[in-house]
């Protein structure tokens, strides 16, 4: 009887080891996904801020170019 339980016990232990391994991999994938989502949001926010600053600079340049073209003083 003990000889029949040994392979079963080994299978049970192997199954638990596999489940633990899968849990570790799943947890790691979730952490990576969370990091990537956070990184994406951070990059989008920074790019939006940069875009606003560039747009404001472009408007100022266009305004200054228009004044220079008309011969107005910039003071």
From Swiss-Prot:
- Gene3D superfamilies under this entry? 1.20.5.110
Does the keyword Metal-binding belong to this entry?
A: no
Which keywords annotate this record? Acetylation, Coiled coil, Cytoplasm, Cytoskeleton
Matches recorded under InterPro entries:
BRICK1 (IPR033378)
Q: Which GO terms describe its cellular component?
A: cytoskeleton; cytosol; extracellular exosome; lamellipodium; SCAR complex
- N-acetylalanine PTM positions read 2
Gene Ontology MF terms: identical protein binding; protein-containing complex binding
Q: What is its main location?
A: cytoplasm
Coiled coil ranges (UniProt) are: 41-72
Q: Where in the cell is it found?
A: Cytoplasm, Cytoskeleton
For the keyword Cytoplasm, the answer is: yes
Q: Which biological process annotations from GO are given for this protein?
A: actin filament organization; cell motility; fibroblast proliferation; in utero embryonic development; positive regulation of Arp2/3 complex-mediated actin nucleation; positive regulation of fibroblast proliferation; positive regulation of lamellipodium assembly; positive regulation of protein-containing complex assembly
Question: Family, per the entry?
Answer: Belongs to the BRK1 family.
Subunit field text: Homotrimer when in free form. Directly interacts with WASF2. Component of the WAVE1 complex composed of ABI2, CYFIP1 or CYFIP2, BRK1, NCKAP1 and WASF1/WAVE1. Within the complex, a heterodimer containing NCKAP1 and CYFIP1 interacts with a heterotrimer formed by WAVE1, ABI2 and BRK1.
Q: What does this protein do?
A: Involved in regulation of actin and microtubule organization. Part of a WAVE complex that activates the Arp2/3 complex. As component of the WAVE1 complex, required for BDNF-NTRK2 endocytic trafficking and signaling from early endosomes.
PANTHER family according to UniProt = PROTEIN BRICK1
Q: What is this protein called?
A: Protein BRICK1
Species of origin reads Homo sapiens (Human)
């Amino acid at each position: 009887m003990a000889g029949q339980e040994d392979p079963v016990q080994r299978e049970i232990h192997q199954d638990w080891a596999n489940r633990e391994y899968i849990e570790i991999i799943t947890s790691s994938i979730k952490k990576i996904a969370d990091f990537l989502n956070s990184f994406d949001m951070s990059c989008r926010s920074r790019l939006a801020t940069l875009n606003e600053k560039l747009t404001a600079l472009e408007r100022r340049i266009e305004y200054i170019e228009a004044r220079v073209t008309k011969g107005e003083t910039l003071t």
